[in-house]
UniProtKB/Swiss-Prot annotation:
Enzyme active site: 47
Source domain of life: Bacteria
InterPro entries in alphabetical order: PsdUridine_synth_cat_dom_sf, PsdUridine_synth_N, PUA-like_sf, PUA_sf, tRNA_psdUridine_synth_TruB, tRNA_sdUridine_synth_fam1_C, TruB_C
NCBIfam families linked to this entry: TruB
Source organism per UniProt: Photorhabdus laumondii subsp. laumondii (strain DSM 15139 / CIP 105565 / TT01)
Listed name of the protein: tRNA pseudouridine synthase B
Gene Ontology BP terms: mRNA pseudouridine synthesis; tRNA pseudouridine synthesis
Pfam families referenced in this protein's UniProt entry, alphabetically: TruB-C_2 (PF09157), TruB_C_2 (PF16198), TruB_N (PF01509)
Enzyme Commission identifier(s): 5.4.99.25
Entry keyword Transcription: no
Entry keywords, A to Z: Isomerase, tRNA processing
Length: 315
């Protein structure tokens, strides 16, 4: 007897509006249970303090989550000036308090230093791993690990307001950028210290923020399904974006079914309409319905060579 698969073969991306004070993994597990999905993964953790867009990939969509990890992000952040904490946010312990003695001109000049391409040393309170363990585990033991500065890009850093000891900013940045570290570094540059008291992720890649869904909305739909004695999927599956939405910007190669059959077996195939760029990544679809079947690269021979394939569900 074959092993019974747990959960549904449901595939797609849910844009979860993560609530405050739960971990990204806890939020992921709640979504997985509500959808009764056999497989799920998120695309870039948010701190427990943070709220906002957390794309949750279900089923075969998990194969393409790396492209969301690599994408740009946009955040709204409120910092408290005059206090520095060990975690660079309000969940940590205050380690210094200093007077706020600066002008708008000084603030603007300091903010400008964080725009564009810079190098950032990640916080000890991050999920980056050192010798197989997250840095935050070392930090909780009082162990400081040397970290290398990493290149980041801040495409846009917009000043929103400065009132008393609160500074509000909107930041559009590259992958791997730690907003807490930007705020901590800014506080040190200003000479007063700073830490994050509010953080919301507004956008990941080009996903529309009006498609975000809260856990409360999911629970309400789950309750409605139970009351109506219908499968919960009838009410919530329509909330999912297509599994290839993370790579919608890739050039498309459409294969006729007879050629697609070879591609789905892992073979490189020829397409009359392949993009000219060798080694370019493409999104592969099948037939007139343009069903997404995987991603590929165009190899030196001009063939469409599979890189990741969608495994079709078998009843």
């Amino acid at each position: 007897m074959g092993r019974h698969r747990r959960g549904r073969d449901i595939h797609g991306v849910l844009l979860l509006d993560k609530p405050q004070d739960i971990s990204s993994n806890d939020a992921l597990q709640k979504v997985k249970r509500i959808f009764n999905a056999s497989k799920a993964g998120h695309t870039g953790a948010l701190d427990p303090l943070a709220t906002g867009m957390l794309p949750v990939c279900l089923g075969e969509a998990t194969k393409f989550s790396q492209f969301l990890l690599d994408s740009d992000k946009r955040y709204r952040v409120i910092a408290r000036l005059g206090q520095r904490t060990d975690t660079s946010d309000s969940h940590g312990q205050i380690i210094s308090e200093r007077a706020i003695q600066l002008s708008q001109v000084q603030l603007d000049a300091a903010l400008d230093k964080f725009r564009g391409d810079t190098m950032q040393i990640p916080s000890m309170y991050s999920a980056l791993k050192y010798q197989g363990k997250p840095l935050y585990e070392y930090a909780r033991q009082g162990i400081e690990v040397e970290r290398e500065a990493r290149p980041i890009t801040v495409y846009e850093l917009q000043f929103i307001r400065w009132e008393n000891d609160e500074l509000e900013l909107e930041i559009h940045c590259s992958k791997g950028t730690y907003i807490r570290t930007i705020i901590d570094d800014l506080g040190e540059l200003l000479g007063c210290g700073a830490h994050v008291i509010y953080l919301r992720r507004l956008q990941v890649a080009n996903y529309p923020n009006d498609r975000m869904v809260t856990l409360e909305q999911l629970y309400e739909l789950q309750k409605q399904a139970k009351d109506q004695e219908i499968p919960v999927g009838e009410l919530i599956d329509s909330l999912l974006l297509p599994m290839d939405s993370a790579i919608a910007h890739f050039p498309e190669v459409n294969l006729i079914p007879v050629v697609a059959a070879y591609f789905k077996q892992g073979q490189a195939v020829r397409s009359a309409k392949s993009p000219a760029l060798v080694e370019s990544m493409v999104r592969v679809t099948e037939g007139d319905e343009r069903k997404f079947i995987g991603i590929a690269v165009i190899n030196d021979d001009g063939l469409v060579a599979p890189r990741r394939l969608v495994v079709e569900s078998r009843d």
